[in-house]
């Protein structure tokens, strides 16, 4: 399981194929790279007093490990939650749903493209029912908005 040691944290979690940002279907996802997304996230989080932990993985189990670790940090009051772009796992992963639900990790599901303006199979999300919010179709700016939302969120 990953270890995290600093205070106050926010996890930026990216799923499969997001390592290809900037070159994969730019008409759908734009020309920004994953490094650009990371820079935007850090630039947004730093003035809010947040430390970003940025992760991209093409492997479901690795994403689950980070969700588990951050769920524990949130319970300890050391993290606010996660901005999570699950990529194609959005539409297929009961395991990610169960990890978020089981840990209580506050997640804002984030998509660069408007998944509802795309193929019908992309219209269903297994994550949305356990997310505290969903942002879609606003490009990489959605990550910044999600960070701001977590920073200003009042826990239930």
Where are each of the predicted segments found?
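A charged, well-structured terminal subsegment
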Residues: 136-156
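Short beta->alpha junction loops
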Residues: 51-61
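Short Gly/Thr/Asp-enriched flexible loops that form oxyanion-binding sites at enzyme active sites
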Residues: 91-105
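Short catalytic helix/loop segments, enriched in acidic residues and glycine
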Residues: 27-46
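Short glycine-rich anion-binding loops that position phosphate/pyrophosphate groups of nucleotides
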Residues: 16-18, 87-90, 113-115
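Short acidic/histidine-rich motifs immediately flanking catalytic phosphotransfer sites
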Residues: 70-82
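Extreme N-terminal starter segment of soluble prokaryotic enzymes
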Residues: 6-11
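Short, acidic/small-residue loops that bind anionic groups at enzyme active sites
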Residues: 101-118
């Amino acid at each position: 399981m990953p270890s995290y040691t600093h205070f106050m944290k926010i996890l930026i979690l990216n799923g499969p194929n997001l390592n290809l940002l900037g070159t994969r279907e730019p008409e759908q996802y734009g020309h920004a790279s994953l490094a650009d997304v990371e820079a935007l996230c850090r630039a947004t989080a730093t003035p809010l007093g947040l430390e970003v932990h940025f992760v991209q993985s093409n492997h479901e189990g690795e994403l689950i490990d980070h969700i588990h670790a951050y769920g524990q940090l949130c319970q300890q009051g050391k993290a606010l939650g996660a901005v999570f772009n699950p990529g194609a796992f959005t539409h297929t992963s009961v395991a990610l749903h169960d990890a978020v639900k089981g840990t209580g990790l506050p997640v804002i599901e984030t998509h660069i493209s408007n998944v509802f303006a795309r193929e019908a199979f992309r219209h269903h999300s297994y994550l949305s029912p356990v997310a505290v919010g969903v942002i879609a179709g606003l490009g990489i700016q959605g990550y910044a908005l999600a960070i701001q939302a977590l920073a200003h969120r009042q826990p239930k």
